[in-house]
């Protein structure tokens, strides 16, 4: 896996070069960071909302571009949303760590494959 940034914030190493997707990735980082800072129900709900919105946009772009890896990519999104959608506040450290690691590995390991293809 890739190094998990501390403090947990988006940096240039995560750029996918699609402005909307980069901005949405920043919001997911912030959503996870806010759950670290305050693992309350409103912060968890915000994380689920911004993640769902982002996945919808990213998948629409992949569909429009007829991106070849769209099916396994959507499955990863679905699995992650099921995981975070099933959490309840307060979110424990193990699940926060899971989210932190999943996002870093997903952007750098999976999203980076669509650079220049959407």
Curated annotation (Swiss-Prot):
Q: Which residues bind Fe cation 1?
A: 25, 54, 58, 111
Tell me yes or no: is Iron among this UniProt entry's keywords. yes
Keywords of the record, alphabetical order, are:
Iron, Metal-binding, Muscle protein, Oxygen transport, Transport
**Superkingdom:** Eukaryota
Query: What GO molecular-function term can you cite, just one?
Result: oxygen carrier activity
Which residues are recorded as binding Fe cation 2? Answer: 58, 73, 77, 106, 111
Task: Tell me the InterPro entries matching this sequence.
Answer: Haemerythrin, Haemerythrin_Fe_BS, Hemerythrin, Hemerythrin-like, Hemerythrin-like_sf, Hemerythrin_metal-bd
Q: Which residues form a coiled coil?
A: none
Q: In which tissues is it expressed?
A: Muscle.
PROSITE patterns with a match to the protein in the record: HEMERYTHRINS (PS00550)
Give the similarity note.
Belongs to the hemerythrin family.
Q: How does it assemble?
A: Monomer.
Instruction: Briefly state the protein's biological role.
Output: Myohemerythrin is an oxygen-binding protein found in the retractor muscles of certain worms. The oxygen-binding site contains two iron atoms.
Q: What is this protein called?
A: Myohemerythrin
Q: Taxonomy-wise, where does this protein's organism fall, top ranks first? A: Eukaryota, Metazoa, Spiralia, Lophotrochozoa, Annelida
């Amino acid at each position: 896996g890739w190094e998990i940034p501390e403090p947990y914030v988006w940096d240039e190493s995560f750029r996918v070069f699609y402005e909307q997707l980069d901005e949405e990735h920043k919001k997911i980082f912030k959503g996870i960071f806010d759950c670290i800072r305050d693992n309350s129900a409103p912060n968890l709900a915000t994380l689920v909302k911004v993640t769902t919105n982002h996945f919808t946009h990213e998948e629409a772009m992949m569909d429009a571009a007829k991106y070849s890896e769209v099916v396994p990519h959507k499955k990863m999104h679905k699995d992650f949303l099921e995981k975070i959608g099933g959490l309840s506040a307060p979110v424990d450290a193990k699940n926060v760590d899971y989210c932190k690691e999943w996002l870093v590995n997903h952007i750098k390991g999976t999203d980076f494959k669509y650079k220049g293809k959407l």
